[in-house]
């Protein structure tokens, strides 16, 4: 008896399917209640409850399964049901500020069917949004359960887009038991076209005067403008808003008339009142952060002259860190008549002390330094008697932090932060202010648009479409507006860095670059101008001493003189013709054409400038970068290098220049160590300090000790040990015991300092601190040799090894050496064959991630870079440049060391070696070292001197299509035509000198014989009177049979590399089991292979009517593919499988007499001889 089948409303099946289900479904749909029917197969009827005969049905339901949204909830969160029946996410434990959740996971659709209470989108680069469908809990994670905030006080999470995902970040500390409520970040809300949460405004009094004490207090973290009562979620937005009020106040007329005019036009406008004492205290707390808050002094009346004029705005382009602190001297208890702009400024500063609900404003303020700096930008306090600016270090000991509120990235100044903040709105059309007129692409920065126009909408040649040409860089544009916007100034690089002498096209780029060099520490004693380097300051100070008149621009304009005569004119180098922006830069460049007068006393290397020499010292002492400034100067001074440049071409007296070497006996000074050494040896008869290893001499003992570090492996003087402290584990040298002990922490293996961004761990805290510079992407360590910037000192030290040629990391497989360990590890992966990175689009694997990323461009953007010579396409510009360099850039003709073939490009040489000498690429010399001497195969053991074969230069110029046609033509030649092929000119083949060009042209041709198991083929002729065949004749008719070896190689054709006659006395072959011999007939073209030593014996024959040739194949694969000794490889293991040749096919040479020494015939033995064809 079968169990009954259960049907539910809507046709859903309980036990199994029935054909009558649709009828039951229709019956159920007519009723208002859900009806469940039971189909009984015994009585063939439906029952609404149970069958009278069989009884009730046992119901089995599925076990309860949580949805994806509820099962993905973190352990420190829980879902609670509220009183109104809704559900919310609550914190089980306290969540600190800046805690990030995400990414938000859901099904992504192009458009919503129904918008949810808290819609989310992701804006792509093309501007089209992708919507998040949060209708199904099984498609989303727990973040869909977080309810949106309705008021600012409820919000504790901020939603924002980062990349192609959406994240939630806590905007304040969330205590345990608090519900999580989310709303959009400021810029994300602008993209989503959603309003920001606003605080309810306070009621305005009947008189129209707003009282700050009566205003409604905003929630924590909200900022209210006291001028217009607008509310802002972030302090930076309030700052930018307040600057607009200040601009309006600045444009109004000053004095009491302004006040009256404003009252007449706007009768309902609130009157401005003097600030209260509390507001004045707030002003002081904002302005002075370096010292603790002090109570205002009582009982002292201020002087009338102390009253300051209102604050005004000046447009300052300098970064915010160069703006001085502003200290106002308005007494807090002295009421002053306030103008509207003063009142606005007081409201601004009074509000900026802290949010209005904060009880203590001063301790909370240091947490918002970036906002204060952004507001103080450009504010200068002026007086009637002039401008007074007091420079105070900003924020004292408090470190300035410019942090992005969206992604938490930290910047050095507010201008970089403001530029970065716009990048978060790069996908929203509303945030992009600059539009490309050609492709309508939007950009948030003007610099990005300029770069886009120069790269995407310009060419280097003028044509009918691109007819607007830039006079500076030569680029052409399709539209005139694009050329005007381009505004190229690349050739007019008039701004030079004083630290590293690099040139920049704009002053703003130079200012950004100067931040890499740190603070300006050296001031001119005459004009107090600050410099980064002391030598540059001294050079500047000489201009004052020389009486150079400093002319102000105002004086020139007043006198009517032309400004052109004082403008820096471009100057060209008289030696090389290079043009510089001014004569001073050209004079610095002229030093490169002169003598290298600054010599390293340790290694003897010479330099043009002393600052480059001082940077070079880091190569010898790796830990010198860890010293502070005082220790570094003292240590460098010990080895005889001063911080001043000794310019021999200077017009000043010798006494004005500092000297490095001073004689203690006669008080004479010298600029170079060699001059000082010569002086003490000739005048005072002193020997100095000599190195017993390299026999160099030094005047100073400290320089001698520093030099001895080079000979650290063979130190003769025990006193030098105080300068040398080697590590017993790795052998690295340190100049102090403290640095050595600190270095030993690396070898303990304990890495207790982890990076929070990438998870990498380090043994020391200073190593972690140095590693953090990698994430900042600031390259402040410049190479003194090439000017390349590095992120860390460690990277600079390794980079300097490239200039020195130091390669200390060796591959244990192929013994190739590298300067950096990371490059060696990448190279070693090629030996292991490990490929950890796979392309998810095509399944191809790679050993390096960057190689895989480059490969993915084939699937995404395709091959966009085309070679103008051969029309090959490449993914990246670098690959195209590499192709042109290797393939099309002609170099001096190179000859193959094995066969003498000449090629003109590196790619041709690589192709030649791969096709003609594949064993050189596959077999290393190290693999043959363990073999016995008797098995070594070389030219002496074979007894054949190979001729030097090569191709003519004219033949190399032919394309590969011409070569293919030439090969096809040669294969169609008849045997009698091939018999007339010439022989290369050689001392052995002197009877064929006139036919060398024809022969050499055919030797280098490509064939199908890319054979791994064949190293060399020597073809010899039996009769010197018979014309020798060409290199490919006689082997093309060999019967092809698949050959199985240990390596699994197969080949179809063979290519000889030398052709000649075999004579008994001078060309005797020393055959062994490693040589495979093929005997072939020059007339019929048939061939036989011999694989034993006694198969071919050379002895004179009376006459050779049917001359034969012998080809000897020297097999190197048998040396490396088998462990068996060489003598047993062919005879016992038979690594090659041959097919026997019938005896009737064996060529039997006639036994006619012939002159000895002139005809050589291979003796073919009878039944015992094994002859095979392939």
From Swiss-Prot:
<feature type="zinc finger region" description="C2H2-type 12">
    <location>
        <begin position="781"/>
        <end position="803"/>
    </location>
</feature>
<keyword id="KW-0678">Repressor</keyword>
<comment type="function">
    <text>Sequence-specific DNA-binding transcriptional regulator. Plays a role as a molecular node in a transcriptional network regulating embryonic development and cell fate decision. Stimulates the expression of upstream key transcriptional activators and repressors of the Wnt/beta-catenin and MAPK/ERK pathways, respectively, that are essential for naive pluripotency and self-renewal maintenance of embryonic stem cells (ESCs). Specifically promotes SPRY1 and RSPO1 transcription activation through recognition and direct binding of a specific DNA sequence in their promoter regions.</text>
</comment>
<feature type="compositionally biased region" description="Basic and acidic residues">
    <location>
        <begin position="261"/>
        <end position="271"/>
    </location>
</feature>
<feature type="zinc finger region" description="C2H2-type 15">
    <location>
        <begin position="865"/>
        <end position="888"/>
    </location>
</feature>
<feature type="cross-link" description="Glycyl lysine isopeptide (Lys-Gly) (interchain with G-Cter in SUMO2)">
    <location>
        <position position="552"/>
    </location>
</feature>
<feature type="region of interest" description="Disordered">
    <location>
        <begin position="252"/>
        <end position="307"/>
    </location>
</feature>
<feature type="region of interest" description="Disordered">
    <location>
        <begin position="1147"/>
        <end position="1174"/>
    </location>
</feature>
<dbReference type="GO" id="GO:1990841">
    <property type="term" value="F:promoter-specific chromatin binding"/>
</dbReference>
<keyword id="KW-0479">Metal-binding</keyword>
<dbReference type="Pfam" id="PF21549">
    <property type="entry name" value="PRDM2_PR"/>
</dbReference>
<dbReference type="GO" id="GO:0045944">
    <property type="term" value="P:positive regulation of transcription by RNA polymerase II"/>
</dbReference>
<keyword id="KW-0217">Developmental protein</keyword>
<feature type="compositionally biased region" description="Basic residues">
    <location>
        <begin position="292"/>
        <end position="304"/>
    </location>
</feature>
<feature type="zinc finger region" description="C2H2-type 13">
    <location>
        <begin position="809"/>
        <end position="831"/>
    </location>
</feature>
<protein>
    <recommendedName>
        <fullName>PR domain zinc finger protein 15</fullName>
        <ecNumber>2.1.1.-</ecNumber>
    </recommendedName>
</protein>
<keyword id="KW-0862">Zinc</keyword>
<feature type="region of interest" description="Disordered">
    <location>
        <begin position="957"/>
        <end position="1007"/>
    </location>
</feature>
<feature type="zinc finger region" description="C2H2-type 14">
    <location>
        <begin position="837"/>
        <end position="859"/>
    </location>
</feature>
<keyword id="KW-1017">Isopeptide bond</keyword>
<feature type="zinc finger region" description="C2H2-type 9">
    <location>
        <begin position="689"/>
        <end position="711"/>
    </location>
</feature>
<dbReference type="Pfam" id="PF00096">
    <property type="entry name" value="zf-C2H2"/>
</dbReference>
<keyword id="KW-0832">Ubl conjugation</keyword>
<keyword id="KW-0010">Activator</keyword>
<dbReference type="Pfam" id="PF23573">
    <property type="entry name" value="zf-C2H2_PRDM15"/>
</dbReference>
<feature type="zinc finger region" description="C2H2-type 6">
    <location>
        <begin position="571"/>
        <end position="593"/>
    </location>
</feature>
<feature type="compositionally biased region" description="Low complexity">
    <location>
        <begin position="1154"/>
        <end position="1174"/>
    </location>
</feature>
<dbReference type="GO" id="GO:0090263">
    <property type="term" value="P:positive regulation of canonical Wnt signaling pathway"/>
</dbReference>
<keyword id="KW-0804">Transcription</keyword>
<dbReference type="InterPro" id="IPR044409">
    <property type="entry name" value="PRDM15_PR-SET"/>
</dbReference>
<keyword id="KW-0949">S-adenosyl-L-methionine</keyword>
<feature type="zinc finger region" description="C2H2-type 3; degenerate">
    <location>
        <begin position="468"/>
        <end position="486"/>
    </location>
</feature>
<keyword id="KW-0863">Zinc-finger</keyword>
<dbReference type="GO" id="GO:0008270">
    <property type="term" value="F:zinc ion binding"/>
</dbReference>
<feature type="compositionally biased region" description="Basic residues">
    <location>
        <begin position="962"/>
        <end position="973"/>
    </location>
</feature>
<keyword id="KW-0539">Nucleus</keyword>
<dbReference type="GO" id="GO:0008168">
    <property type="term" value="F:methyltransferase activity"/>
</dbReference>
<keyword id="KW-0808">Transferase</keyword>
<feature type="compositionally biased region" description="Acidic residues">
    <location>
        <begin position="644"/>
        <end position="655"/>
    </location>
</feature>
<dbReference type="GO" id="GO:0016604">
    <property type="term" value="C:nuclear body"/>
</dbReference>
<dbReference type="GO" id="GO:0043409">
    <property type="term" value="P:negative regulation of MAPK cascade"/>
</dbReference>
<feature type="zinc finger region" description="C2H2-type 11">
    <location>
        <begin position="753"/>
        <end position="775"/>
    </location>
</feature>
């Amino acid at each position: 008896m079968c169990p009954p089948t259960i049907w539910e409303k809507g046709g859903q099946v309980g036990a199994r399917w029935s054909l009558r289900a649709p009828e039951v479904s229709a019956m159920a749909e007519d009723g208002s209640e859900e009806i469940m029917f039971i189909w009984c197969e015994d009585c063939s009827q439906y029952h609404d409850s149970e069958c009278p005969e069989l009884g009730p049905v046992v119901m089995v339901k599925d076990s309860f399964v949580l949805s994806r949204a509820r099962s993905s909830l973190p352990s420190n969160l829980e879902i609670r049901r509220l009183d109104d029946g809704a559900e919310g996410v609550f914190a089980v434990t306290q969540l600190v500020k800046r805690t990030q959740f995400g990414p938000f996971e859901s099904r992504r659709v192009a458009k919503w069917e129904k918008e949810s209470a808290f819609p989310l989108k992701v804006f792509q680069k093309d501007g089209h949004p992708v919507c998040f469908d949060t209708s199904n809990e099984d498609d989303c994670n727990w973040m869909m359960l977080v309810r949106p905030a309705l008021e600012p006080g409820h919000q504790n999470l901020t939603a924002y887009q980062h990349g192609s995902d959406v994240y939630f970040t806590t905007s304040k500390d969330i205590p345990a038991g608090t519900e999580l409520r989310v709303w959009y970040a400021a810029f994300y809300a602008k993209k989503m076209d959603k309003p920001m949460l606003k605080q309810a405004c306070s009621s305005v009094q009947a008189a129209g005067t707003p009282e700050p004490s009566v205003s409604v207090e905003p929630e924590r973290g909200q900022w209210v403008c006291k001028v217009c009562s607008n509310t802002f979620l972030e302090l930076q937005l309030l700052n930018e808003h307040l600057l607009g009020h200040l601009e309006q106040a600045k444009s109004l007329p000053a004095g009491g008339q302004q006040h009256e005019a404003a009252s007449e036009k706007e009768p309902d406008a609130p009157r401005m009142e003097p600030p209260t004492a509390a507001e004045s205290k707030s002003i002081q707390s904002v302005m002075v952060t370096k010292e603790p808050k002090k109570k205002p002094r009582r009982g002292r009346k201020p002087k009338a002259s102390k009253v300051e004029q209102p604050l005004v705005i000046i447009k300052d382009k300098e970064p915010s860190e160069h703006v001085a602190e502003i200290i106002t001297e308005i007494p807090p208890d002295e009421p002053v008549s306030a103008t509207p702009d003063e009142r606005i400024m007081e409201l601004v500063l009074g509000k900026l002390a802290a949010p209005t609900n904060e009880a203590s404003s001063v301790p909370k303020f240091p947490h918002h330094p970036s906002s204060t700096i952004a507001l103080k930008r450009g504010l200068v306090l002026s007086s009637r008697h002039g401008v007074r600016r007091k420079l105070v270090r900003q924020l004292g000991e408090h470190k300035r932090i410019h942090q992005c509120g969206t992604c938490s990235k930290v910047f050095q100044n507010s201008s970089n932060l403001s530029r970065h903040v716009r990048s978060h709105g790069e996908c929203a059309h509303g945030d992009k202010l600059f539009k490309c007129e050609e492709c309508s692409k939007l950009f948030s920065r003007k610099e990005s648009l300029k770069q886009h126009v120069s790269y995407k909408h310009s060419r280097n040649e003028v044509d009918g479409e691109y007819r607007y040409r830039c006079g500076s860089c030569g680029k052409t544009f399709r539209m005139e507006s694009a050329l005007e916007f381009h505004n190229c100034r690349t050739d007019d690089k008039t701004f030079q860095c004083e630290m590293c002498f690099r040139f920049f096209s704009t002053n703003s780029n130079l200012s950004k670059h100067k931040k890499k060099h740190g603070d300006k520490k050296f001031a001119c004693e005459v004009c107090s101008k600050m410099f980064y380097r002391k030598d540059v300051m001294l050079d500047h100070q000489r201009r004052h001493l020389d009486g150079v008149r400093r002319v102000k621009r105002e004086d020139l304009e007043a006198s009517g003189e032309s400004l052109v005569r004082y403008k820096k004119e471009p100057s060209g180098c008289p030696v090389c013709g290079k043009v510089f922006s001014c004569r001073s830069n050209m004079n610095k460049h002229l030093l490169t054409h002169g003598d290298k007068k600054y010599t390293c006393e340790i290694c003897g290397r010479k330099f043009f400038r002393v600052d480059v020499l001082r940077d070079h010292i880091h190569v010898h002492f790796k830990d010198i970068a860890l010293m502070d400034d005082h220790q570094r100067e003292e240590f460098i001074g010990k080895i005889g290098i001063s911080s001043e440049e000794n310019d021999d071409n200077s017009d000043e007296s010798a006494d004005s220049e500092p000297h490095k070497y001073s004689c203690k006996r006669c008080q004479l000074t010298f600029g170079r160590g060699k001059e000082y050494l010569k002086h003490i040896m000739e005048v005072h008869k002193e020997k100095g300090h000599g190195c017993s290893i390299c026999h160099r001499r030094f005047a100073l003992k400290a320089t001698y000790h520093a030099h001895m570090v080079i000979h650290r492996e063979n130190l003769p003087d025990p006193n030098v040990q105080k300068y040398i402290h080697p590590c017993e584990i790795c052998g690295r040298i340190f100049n102090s015991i403290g640095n050595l002990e600190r270095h030993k922490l690396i070898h303990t293996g304990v890495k207790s300092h982890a990076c929070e961004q990438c998870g990498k761990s380090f043994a020391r805290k200073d190593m972690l601190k140095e590693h953090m510079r990698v994430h900042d992407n600031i390259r402040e360590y410049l190479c003194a040799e090439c000017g390349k910037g590095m992120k860390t000192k460690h990277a600079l030290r390794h980079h300097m090894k490239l200039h020195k040629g130091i390669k200390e990391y060796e591959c244990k497989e192929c013994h190739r050496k590298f300067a950096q360990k990371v490059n060696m590890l990448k190279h070693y992966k090629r030996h292991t064959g490990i490929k950890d990175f796979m392309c998810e689009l095509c399944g191809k694997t790679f050993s390096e991630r960057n190689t895989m990323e480059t490969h993915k461009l084939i699937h995404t953007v395709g091959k966009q870079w085309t070679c103008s010579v051969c029309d090959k396409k490449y993914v990246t510009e670098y690959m195209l440049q590499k192709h042109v360099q290797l393939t099309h850039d002609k170099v001096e003709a190179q000859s193959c060391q094995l066969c003498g073939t000449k090629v003109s490009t590196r790619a041709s040489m690589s192709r030649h070696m791969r096709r003609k000498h594949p064993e050189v690429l596959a077999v290393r010399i190290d693999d043959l070292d363990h073999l016995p001497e008797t098995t070594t195969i070389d030219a002496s053991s074979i007894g054949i001197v190979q001729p030097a074969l090569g191709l003519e230069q004219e033949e190399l110029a032919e394309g590969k299509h011409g070569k293919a046609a030439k090969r096809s033509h040669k294969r169609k030649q008849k045997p009698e035509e091939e018999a007339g092929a010439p022989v290369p000119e050689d001392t052995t083949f002197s009877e064929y000198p006139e036919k060398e060009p024809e022969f050499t042209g055919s030797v280098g041709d490509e064939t199908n014989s890319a054979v791994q198991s064949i190293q060399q083929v020597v073809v010899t002729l039996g009769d010197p009177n018979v014309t020798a065949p060409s290199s490919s004749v006689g082997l093309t008719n060999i019967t092809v049979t698949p050959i199985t070896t240990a390596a699994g190689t197969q080949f179809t054709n063979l290519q000889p590399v030398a052709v000649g006659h075999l004579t008994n006395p001078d060309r005797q072959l020393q055959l062994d089991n490693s040589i495979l011999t093929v005997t072939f007939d020059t007339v019929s073209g048939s061939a036989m292979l011999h694989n034993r030593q006694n198969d071919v014996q050379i002895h004179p024959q009376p006459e050779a009517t049917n001359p034969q040739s012998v080809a000897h194949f020297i097999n190197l694969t048998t040396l490396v593919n088998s462990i068996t000794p060489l003598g047993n490889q062919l005879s016992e293991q038979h690594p090659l499988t041959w097919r026997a040749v019938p005896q009737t096919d064996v060529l039997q040479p006639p036994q006619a007499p012939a002159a000895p020494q002139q005809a050589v015939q291979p003796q073919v033995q009878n039944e015992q001889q094994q002859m095979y064809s392939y």
